[in-house]
Regions:
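Glycine-rich ThDP/TPP pyrophosphate-binding loop and its adjacent helix/strand module
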Residues: 1-93, 283-387
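Thiamine diphosphate
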Residues: 14, 89, 93-313, 318, ...
Length: 387
């Protein structure tokens, strides 16, 4: 691995990972170098105990004898939760440094206009702007009038063109699939070496790295990250998606090409079990909108969430508009709602999500012709319905 980084032109330091002097020197040396740096720390698992360099050291250090012998080697007190004096002193110095920087920041913040202070506070409290709901409703109304047949990935791009200029804290991106995921709105510029103000990140083919970095942004606060890839590739992002749920952060995962209707890529790209495992993940909202109206509503709910990540599953293929009558209420926030009521005595209820909703409506028409009263329920989010 070390030679691999060297061959790529990186600045590489190989050090004893247990030597604080070497660690400090390597960090200082890396800071002075204008190349990307990799510090390779050679270490021993369970250093200082009888379990050193064995598999036992991976999970057995809660053993009292091992703890006592390790502390003895280090010269530490046998008291529980003992913090060595030199370590405590170092942390106290770091705290003083942080306090100085914090006070300086607070003075700068106090000089801002009340409007900027309020907007900053809004972003960090994860409140959506008051104007967002009205803008989304205008979009929904236009869709109900025009009734386009578009893929929901395109619908997502359309509503992002409404959302992103209003919510300037959003940071978008894609794992090398921007043109397919439709995650870049027209107002966004790319974040790169020459443009640090860009709000769109080309992550490359790094789904897990993208998801992990988005989680970091969400944990920092003040930013609302979202990123896209194919639904099938949730496999690669799964660890970070799961951690987002565990950490209760509202990262938004845009997963397009959500069914066998994805096109010519074939079985390797066809999601089969992926929707089920996303829905099975606790504290995760999975949206599968049926048209542009539901897509807009899904985004609205996802952005209003403060402690739950969202998966927005979108189609490659075009879908007809099924919500033809405009309603200002966000019906998708209920999780499910009656899209078409049965005519006559109700005998059948068809429940569907995403691209299957229009199929359910077609089936309803046929059943009604045969005299079977059929209701169609659209269920864009099972988790919200179950609440």
């Amino acid at each position: 691995q070390v030679e691999r980084f060297k061959s790529a032109g990186w600045h590489v330091c190989e050090i004893d990972g247990h030597n604080p002097v070497e660690i400090n020197q390597a960090i200082l040396e890396s800071k002075r170098n204008n190349k990307p740096s990799m510090i390779a720390c050679k270490t021993h698992i369970a250093l200082g105990s009888s379990a050193q360099d064995t598999s036992k050291g991976h999970g057995a250090l809660t053993d009292r004898v091992l703890i006592e012998e390790t502390k003895k080697v280090y010269g530490w007190s046998q008291k529980n939760f003992h913090v060595p004096t030199e370590v405590k002193k170092e942390w106290e110095e770091i705290g003083k440094k942080g306090q100085k920087e914090r006070l300086s920041w607070e003075r700068d913040f106090a000089l801002l206009s009340l409007k900027k202070q309020s907007e900053f506070s809004r972003m960090y409290s994860m409140e959506v702007p008051k104007t967002l709901g009205r803008a989304i409703n205008r979009f929904k109304k236009s869709i109900s009038l025009e009734q386009p047949k578009v893929a929901t990935r395109k619908s997502s791009e359309m509503i992002l063109n409404v959302i992103n200029p209003i919510m300037t804290e959003t940071v978008g991106g894609s794992a090398d699939l921007s043109g397919s995921n439709n995650t870049k709105s027209s107002d966004m510029t790319v974040f790169d070496v020459d443009n640090r103000k860009g709000r769109y990140i080309h992550w490359g083919v790094r789904e897990h790295g993208m998801a992990a970095a988005m989680n970091g942004m969400a944990l920092h606060g003040g930013l609302r990250p979202y990123g896209g890839t194919f639904m099938c590739f949730t496999d690669y992002a799964r660890p970070s998606m799961r951690l987002a749920a565990l950490m209760q952060i509202p990262t938004i995962f845009v997963m397009t090409h959500d069914s066998i209707g994805l096109g010519e890529d074939g079985p390797t790209h066809q999601p089969v079990e992926h929707l089920a495992i996303s829905r099975a993940t606790p504290n995760t909202l999975v949206f599968r909108p049926a048209d542009s109206v539901e897509t807009a509503e899904a985004w609205e709910v996802a952005l209003q969430s403060k402690n739950t990540p969202s998966v927005v599953a979108l189609t490659r293929q075009g879908l007809p508009t099924v919500r033809k009558k405009y309603k200002s209420a966000n019906l998708s926030s209920q999780g499910a709602y009656i899209l078409e009521e049965a005519e006559g005595k109700r005998e059948v209820i068809l429940i569907a999500s995403g691209s299957e909703v229009s199929l359910a409506l077609t089936a309803r028409d046929q059943l009604q012709k045969e005299g079977t009263g059929t209701r169609v329920v659209s269920m864009p989010c099972m988790e919200l319905f179950e609440k």
